[in-house]
A protein has these predicted regions:
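Conserved catalytic/acceptor-binding region of the Class I
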Residues: 117, 123-162
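Class I SAM-dependent methyltransferase Rossmann-like catalytic core
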Residues: 10-21
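A short SAM/SAH-binding and catalytic strip from SAM-dependent methyltransferases
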Residues: 102-116
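A short acidic, Gly/Pro-enriched loop at the edge of an enzyme's catalytic core
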Residues: 92-103
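Conserved alpha-helix/loop element of class I SAM-dependent methyltransferases that forms part
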Residues: 21-38
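N-terminal, positively charged/glycine-rich alpha-helical extensions of SAM-dependent methyltransferases
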Residues: 1-11
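Class I SAM-dependent methyltransferase SAM/SAH-binding core
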Residues: 41-43, 49-93
């Protein structure tokens, strides 16, 4: 992700936190269930204000760390999910040692990364039998008001980036 876009969310961190939906419990639980036995050390990459971090932090035995390129988003995350270690970084440049993670997860963030570079970097940081988990919330366009909102959003230049 270009540096200017990577750090553009922080100015609106409070609005981002208020406006982004939480991740459904069942989806997060499923993602955690498929982790290798004994897996505990998980990095939430592109963690933002901590929506996914918060959900994983409550999992028994989880040792979550949060990584984001935007210092303001990490500041909001530290308020929202106290006690979680935070690091400046990206999926293409993880600030962690080789083979130090059991899993890397990205919530609504994979579309911001260079998938080839990110895959190689995640492969470096995750142990050989580790896991990459990707999760998104999607809009239910079968609901009239959601469909109308989607049409409005698709007129936005930001939505075209997705």
């Amino acid at each position: 992700m270009a540096d200017s876009r990577a750090t553009s969310f922080g100015a609106q961190a409070q609005d981002y936190e208020a406006g982004r939906p939480e991740y459904p419990f069942d989806a997060v639980a499923w993602m955690l269930e498929i982790l290798p036995a004994g897996a505990q050390r998980v990095a939430d990459v592109g963690a933002g204000t901590g929506k996914l971090t918060r959900a994983i932090a409550h999992a028994p035995g989880a040792q979550i760390v949060a990584i984001d390129p935007d210092p303001a988003m990490l500041a909001a995350l530290r308020e929202n999910v106290p006690g979680v270690p935070t690091f400046l970084g990206t999926a293409e440049s993880l600030p962690l040692p080789d083979d130090s993670l059991d899993a890397v997860v990205l919530g609504q963030a994979w579309h911001w990364v260079d998938p080839v570079r990110a895959s190689a970097e995640i492969g470096r940081a995750v142990r050989a039998d580790g896991t990459l988990g990707l999760i998104w919330n999607i809009r239910d366009d079968s609901v009239d008001w959601v469909r109308d909102l989607s049409r409005i959003m698709h007129r936005s230049a930001a939505e075209e980036e997705l």
